Amino acid sequence: MQPEYLPKREGLYDPEFEHDACGVGFVAHLKGNASHDIVQKGLTLLANLEHRGAVGAEKNSGDGAGILTQMPDKFLRRVLKEDGIDLPEFGHYGVGVVFLPKDPQAYAECKTIVEDCIEELGQEFIAWRKVPTANESLGETVKAIEPYVHQVIVKRNPELEDAEAFERKLFVIRK
C-alpha cells in the first residue's frame, strides 16, 4: 500500500522505491567518470545540508556524515606504499570501512573476526589502514563514544572467475 502523500509513478520515478532518508544528496558524472571535482562538489553539498539526520543536544554532536566515492586506486596505492604495502592490480582488491571499539580487547577481537571471515570465504587479508580523523570539533558526548575508523584491504582469490564473483564475496564479508 502506497502512502497518499507520495506522488504517482511517472517516468523513472516509482514511489515503490521510496524510504525515509534525511538530508541525502547526489553528485555524479553521467558517464560515471571519477574526478576530484565531483568529490569537491559532494563536500560542498554536504556542508550546505543544514540537517543530515539526528542532532544531539550539543550543537557539535550530530549524527556524522560522509560521502561515498568510486575506488580511489591512485590514492590508496600512494598511502599504502608509505606503509610498505603493494596493492594488486585494480579490480583484484577490495576496501571496506570498519568502525572498531576503543577497548583494546574488543578492538583486537573485532579485527580477528573480520580477518577470519575473509580467510573463511577464500579471500586474502592484505592489511588494515587506520583512517586519519580530526575530532577537535566534536562535542564531548560524541568523543566519549567515537570509534576507531579503519579500512580493511582484501585481495581477490585468483581462482574467482570474475569481478562479480569477488563483489559477492565482499558483500558476504561485509555482513
Language model features with spans:
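N-terminal segments that mediate ammonia production and transfer
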Residues: 1-175
